[in-house]
Amino acid sequence: MSHSACPKPATARHSQALTGEIRIPGDKSISHRSFMFGGLASGKTRITGLLEGEDVINTGRAMQAMGARIRKEGDVWIINGVGNGCLLQPEAPLDFGNAGTGARLTMGLVGTYDMKTSFIGDASLSKRPMGRVLNPLREMGVQVEAAEGDRMPLTLIGPRTANPIAYRVPMASAQVKSAVLLAGLNTPGVTTVIEPVMTRDHTEKMLQDFGADLTVETDKDGVRHIRIVGQGKLTGQTIDVPGDPSSTAFPLVAALLVEGSEVTIRNVLMNPTRTGLILTLQEMGADIEIIDPRLAGGEDVADLRVKASKLKGVVVPPERAPSMIDEYPVLAIAASFAEGETVMDGLDELRVKESDRLAAVARGLEANGVDCTEGEMSLTVRGRPGGKGLGGGTVATHLDHRIAMSFLVMGLASEKPVTVDDSTMIATSFPEFMGMMAGLGAKIAESGAE
């Protein structure tokens, strides 16, 4: 099931000041985990603010296929979970569509069950490597039948009893860390993840909220040791999902670039493992005011007031990459309008996202007149303040929602329009994007539709 069955190109044109107030859809990471942990916990979980994109809904369907009962009443999702250790073998393969997070976390969750579970996905997901999650599962006793290169379609055959392991995560990946911790939920004894570089910590925080026996210690070198005691009880919770910082990035950068704009974005997740983009834009001279910082569901949340700003190029420290890995495409757009040179390094993870995101961004920038250099793990962008001469190109999105949204943002501020070859897959993470941007005054339309 590929999104490109009927591609819908879209075009963004130079827009007047963007103004207004918006509330961003719920955070994707927390939404996936809310469905998973709610489906696994005993009793009832109630979720408000859930991101209802296709990716998250696919995770919900997978949990239903393994015994969880999920329904929606008004704005509230209500889950009756099966209880930790009580997932059922699904009758058919679990279809994750385009959702890498949903697929990888669920592999961890079900791998240590004494049952057979098959995973399938769309053309884009079937190209993405799963070995980074499968390798620790193999150490725990899980058998894997996979397509070449540890890709989907694949089947996990769980052991009678899983072995607890201590696993040092070889790359900065919250998905790998989370998959091992979730596998540890159904494993006797203590499963340990050693994380040299901290990544988003929603799994740890939320598992603790659900009652898991999970502890985190940071040693003197800054290495995190996360221990989970398996086979404990999880209890249903009430969750209000804060707004997704990765989705916030698009209207935020648009407001910075379109002259005269002032936009307020409500209820944004400000977890420090996710705010690298805001920090970087502020270093570039962005006028971003953080209003009413508060705690909601154990997470830092705030409102952002964003005003059009003259940006200047910066060197982004590579160690910041894990806290903004999904935001580099739209940062590259901001850099295209900044004075001077912006250097982004440590981007190897971008090569294994929904597309080779680094190459896709570089090609899109070149097609629209931006002077940039793509390195093996880096991207250097030399900007043109005011966007003079930029635009006029069509961007190949490679079924990647973030590439599509980033270049539509570009077209709002560039001299000439920017077209993306497909916009259908924006629905995977931000179904309201087109309507929300139009409400602020952005000129974005499906091509052929005026």
Curated annotation (Swiss-Prot):
<dbReference type="Pfam" id="PF00275">
    <property type="entry name" value="EPSP_synthase"/>
</dbReference>
<feature type="binding site">
    <location>
        <position position="28"/>
    </location>
    <ligand>
        <name>phosphoenolpyruvate</name>
    </ligand>
</feature>
<feature type="binding site">
    <location>
        <position position="402"/>
    </location>
    <ligand>
        <name>phosphoenolpyruvate</name>
    </ligand>
</feature>
<dbReference type="InterPro" id="IPR013792">
    <property type="entry name" value="RNA3'P_cycl/enolpyr_Trfase_a/b"/>
</dbReference>
<dbReference type="InterPro" id="IPR036968">
    <property type="entry name" value="Enolpyruvate_Tfrase_sf"/>
</dbReference>
<feature type="binding site">
    <location>
        <position position="357"/>
    </location>
    <ligand>
        <name>phosphoenolpyruvate</name>
    </ligand>
</feature>
<feature type="binding site">
    <location>
        <position position="326"/>
    </location>
    <ligand>
        <name>3-phosphoshikimate</name>
    </ligand>
</feature>
<comment type="similarity">
    <text>Belongs to the EPSP synthase family.</text>
</comment>
<dbReference type="InterPro" id="IPR006264">
    <property type="entry name" value="EPSP_synthase"/>
</dbReference>
<dbReference type="GO" id="GO:0009423">
    <property type="term" value="P:chorismate biosynthetic process"/>
</dbReference>
<dbReference type="GO" id="GO:0005737">
    <property type="term" value="C:cytoplasm"/>
</dbReference>
<feature type="active site" description="Proton acceptor">
    <location>
        <position position="326"/>
    </location>
</feature>
<keyword id="KW-0963">Cytoplasm</keyword>
<feature type="binding site">
    <location>
        <position position="173"/>
    </location>
    <ligand>
        <name>3-phosphoshikimate</name>
    </ligand>
</feature>
<dbReference type="InterPro" id="IPR001986">
    <property type="entry name" value="Enolpyruvate_Tfrase_dom"/>
</dbReference>
<dbReference type="GO" id="GO:0003866">
    <property type="term" value="F:3-phosphoshikimate 1-carboxyvinyltransferase activity"/>
</dbReference>
<feature type="binding site">
    <location>
        <position position="33"/>
    </location>
    <ligand>
        <name>3-phosphoshikimate</name>
    </ligand>
</feature>
<feature type="binding site">
    <location>
        <position position="28"/>
    </location>
    <ligand>
        <name>3-phosphoshikimate</name>
    </ligand>
</feature>
<feature type="binding site">
    <location>
        <position position="175"/>
    </location>
    <ligand>
        <name>phosphoenolpyruvate</name>
    </ligand>
</feature>
<comment type="pathway">
    <text>Metabolic intermediate biosynthesis; chorismate biosynthesis; chorismate from D-erythrose 4-phosphate and phosphoenolpyruvate: step 6/7.</text>
</comment>
<dbReference type="GO" id="GO:0008652">
    <property type="term" value="P:amino acid biosynthetic process"/>
</dbReference>
<keyword id="KW-0057">Aromatic amino acid biosynthesis</keyword>
<feature type="binding site">
    <location>
        <position position="175"/>
    </location>
    <ligand>
        <name>3-phosphoshikimate</name>
    </ligand>
</feature>
<feature type="binding site">
    <location>
        <position position="100"/>
    </location>
    <ligand>
        <name>phosphoenolpyruvate</name>
    </ligand>
</feature>
<feature type="binding site">
    <location>
        <position position="128"/>
    </location>
    <ligand>
        <name>phosphoenolpyruvate</name>
    </ligand>
</feature>
<protein>
    <recommendedName>
        <fullName>3-phosphoshikimate 1-carboxyvinyltransferase</fullName>
        <ecNumber>2.5.1.19</ecNumber>
    </recommendedName>
</protein>
<feature type="binding site">
    <location>
        <position position="29"/>
    </location>
    <ligand>
        <name>3-phosphoshikimate</name>
    </ligand>
</feature>
<keyword id="KW-0028">Amino-acid biosynthesis</keyword>
<comment type="subunit">
    <text>Monomer.</text>
</comment>
<comment type="function">
    <text>Catalyzes the transfer of the enolpyruvyl moiety of phosphoenolpyruvate (PEP) to the 5-hydroxyl of shikimate-3-phosphate (S3P) to produce enolpyruvyl shikimate-3-phosphate and inorganic phosphate.</text>
</comment>
<dbReference type="InterPro" id="IPR023193">
    <property type="entry name" value="EPSP_synthase_CS"/>
</dbReference>
<feature type="binding site">
    <location>
        <position position="353"/>
    </location>
    <ligand>
        <name>3-phosphoshikimate</name>
    </ligand>
</feature>
<keyword id="KW-0808">Transferase</keyword>
<dbReference type="GO" id="GO:0009073">
    <property type="term" value="P:aromatic amino acid family biosynthetic process"/>
</dbReference>
